[in-house]
């Protein structure tokens, strides 16, 4: 069993001084927050680039709250932190051999999540995924551990067959010593009573994979959606969600196309009356109210679902192309960056992969989107309804410009879509980090079945303005030859 007090006070002071020297990048005996951030970058600490975590750590180190950490502050912090780290080490090191193996870390993290890894045969596949994730965390937290890796039972290996030897050379043979454990967790902030859990939460929060949901929404998931069952489930949910929101999409297209409607938020009724002296001031209302009345007079409730069938049709091909192209793009970016695995991709490369995947998916379904918009922009007094209107609109489009008209103005759509993917992902990530720093908990915990975690309504709402102008440009270009910024704002402000 490892003894806690195996080093003298003098040795401990020397070690503290050496650690503090690594953080004191300017060598003036004082460490500021900026110095600590620079030290993490210089020493290639696993939490480098995570300003929120470093700020929390600096606050804990600044014992006297003077915004500066000196050697005295650091010693007080380290002494208290090491006592907590030792107690945690003892709880994980069940065999008390002074070493922690990866399996012991797996069990501890699983207990924190109230999830079993080894004793659930029904979730064997999921368990393997969790073990692999914990293994990646082990490598992330202890990148320099290779020099200290030991293979247990090496003496007995000489007497065993090659098959037995290969069985023993597994992840379970990897371990870290208490010194390595202490040196890593000493520079990790403590939340919810566990530095290890905090470290794992940061690893999970900033090193997980990224995918795209329907309409190019960036989705963070535990592992890439696998299996035909998940694909079908995602498609069905997309069909339901699009059907539920079809009336809002119908109103959106109506307002974009009707450039003659003026917003009562941007203009006073007096100004609107001056432009149209014959109008009744009592009947001047919001464009949204006019849109609802006009559509209802056209065909009742059914009028709000015009074009929804095309929306439903494109769900499955769009999703399959999106996920497939995203994986292919990630592999290409992995080769360009020289990474061994897509998990090691930088966030910038993930942005690019997400944007390109969104563009590929949009390109594949753009003809359907174009046809849907034309159908929704049909004259209100038209006698054609349903499939007759759909087929007639398709024939008219083909006669007007053949295949070229299908891809007309698609560059505006692409510009808005790639910005939507990148901005939504960045905004969601920032908001998620803010929530985590305030609560110390993952704002969207992992589900056991591996279901995806989508950006919340706040992050979605914050960035819709950024890409909506591109959609207006694209859609109005089909309806009219010219588009003015005022018309775009009018369509947005109802």
Curated annotation (Swiss-Prot):
PROSITE patterns: EF_HAND_1, EF_HAND_2, SOLCAR. One of its GO terms (cellular component) is mitochondrion. Ca(2+) 1 binds at residues 65, 70. Keywords: Calcium, Membrane, Metal-binding, Mitochondrion, Mitochondrion inner membrane, Repeat, Transmembrane, Transmembrane helix, Transport. The lineage of its organism: Eukaryota, Fungi, Dikarya, Ascomycota, Saccharomycotina. This is Truncated non-functional calcium-binding mitochondrial carrier SAL1-1. The chain crosses the membrane at residues 231-248, 307-326, 355-368, 409-428, 458-475. Present with 1170 molecules/cell in log phase SD medium.
